[in-house]
């Protein structure tokens, strides 16, 4: 029976089936967006949804909430050369969203990393790592957009909490098969880099993308 919950670990478990190149993608620090742009000729973000919803139990605990509250939830695909590379799921502590993450409302199809890694007030907690089965809620959300991925038994994922002022933001990144075949660029380091201007934000939005942001 497949698990609906993921076991998150402080370190990526050693597994001979995970090639070194894949481990570099999964464990690399700094801005993942910058690394994706370095590894592709064209990069863009497709926003799938942005609306309040209840986070998973392990998510609201990771944010330090004492009970579940509807949180601003943003889901996007990071696309390299017109092929989805990463599914990103972000939830924001609703108590401090407007004060500490004011840019989130107008982000649209721009990358979150472009705002996080240029702000010296943002701090990032250490990564946690997991493998998500097709029954996991985040896999289910992904598979509604990319149903072919339901045949993948496990997809590697990582998450970390970003902090700014009193606010917390949990970002989970699910690595898709196409990305893991690409050569991983050099690590940008813990602080990340200022992002190059090579992002296509002028594409036709889906109906989900046209929903007003909350």
Curated annotation (Swiss-Prot):
Gene3D superfamilies: Chorismate lyase-like
EC numbers on record: 4.1.3.40
Reaction(s) the record says it catalyses: chorismate = 4-hydroxybenzoate + pyruvate
Binding site for substrate: 74, 112, 173
Region (Disordered): 183-214
GO cellular component terms given for this protein: cytosol
Subcellular location: Cytoplasm
Keyword set includes Transcription regulation: no
GO BP term (any one): pyruvate biosynthetic process
InterPro entries from the UniProt entry: Chorismate--pyruvate_lyase (IPR007440), Chorismate_lyase_/UTRA_dom_sf (IPR028978)
Record-stated family: Belongs to the UbiC family.
PANTHER family, per the entry: CHORISMATE PYRUVATE-LYASE (PTHR38683:SF1)
Function: Removes the pyruvyl group from chorismate, with concomitant aromatization of the ring, to provide 4-hydroxybenzoate (4HB) for the ubiquinone pathway.
Name under which the protein is recorded: Probable chorismate pyruvate-lyase
UniProt source species: Cupriavidus metallidurans (strain ATCC 43123 / DSM 2839 / NBRC 102507 / CH34)
Gene field: ubiC
